[in-house]
């Protein structure tokens, strides 16, 4: 095989691989890691929601985002007190969700033991650390993307392409398309 490949190479029948410049490859690593951390956050949110439901707290039945302001206030109250009454629930809810306080109260009728409160605290601490880690990654990404502001702006002008998508595109294929023969080649390479 190696003899055949060397023969093809000497005959000029092999094309070089497309490899973006170093700073693009480094940016790609960070961007892919960002996606991994987002998956970790989603898994942790699902773990917390499952734990709450198994403990008798069906927050997602009445609160669309249990990690939003109202949901988070309820979770923090449960960590401290293990249960919640109507007065405490009213102080945890924001204006929009207060209209459904009686329905929400029925969905949070469980009680957490000391072990469950400690476990929920651990779960939330891990969730918060993942969110903080994601913010650090995004700060690094913004700094790394600064030299590509013009390209990001150009990509954003395409309908449906957000800044996040623009960054992902640049991270995967770079900005120099000279080594690429056709659009089909870059599509094939990028997947």
Name each model feature, range by range:
Residues 1-191:
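A detector of single, family-specific signature residues
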């Amino acid at each position: 095989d190696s003899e055949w490949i060397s023969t093809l190479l000497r005959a000029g029948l092999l094309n070089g691989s497309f490899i973006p410049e170093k700073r693009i490859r480094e940016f790609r690593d960070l961007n892919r890691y960002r996606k991994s951390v987002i998956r970790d956050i989603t898994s942790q949110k699902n773990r917390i929601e499952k734990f709450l439901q198994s403990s008798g707290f069906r927050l997602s039945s009445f609160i669309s985002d249990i990690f939003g302001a109202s949901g988070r206030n309820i979770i923090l109250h449960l960590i401290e007190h293990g249960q919640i009454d109507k007065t405490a629930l009213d102080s945890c809810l924001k204006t929009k969700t207060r209209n459904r306080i009686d329905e929400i109260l029925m969905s949070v009728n469980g009680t957490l033991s000391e072990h469950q409160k400690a476990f929920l605290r651990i779960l939330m601490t891990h969730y918060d650390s993942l969110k903080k880690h994601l913010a650090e990654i995004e700060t690094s990404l913004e700094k790394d993307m600064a030299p590509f502001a013009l390209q990001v702006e150009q990509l954003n002008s395409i309908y449906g392409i957000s800044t996040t998508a623009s960054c992902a595109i640049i991270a995967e294929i770079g900005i120099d398309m000279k080594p690429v023969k056709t659009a089909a080649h870059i599509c094939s390479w990028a997947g």
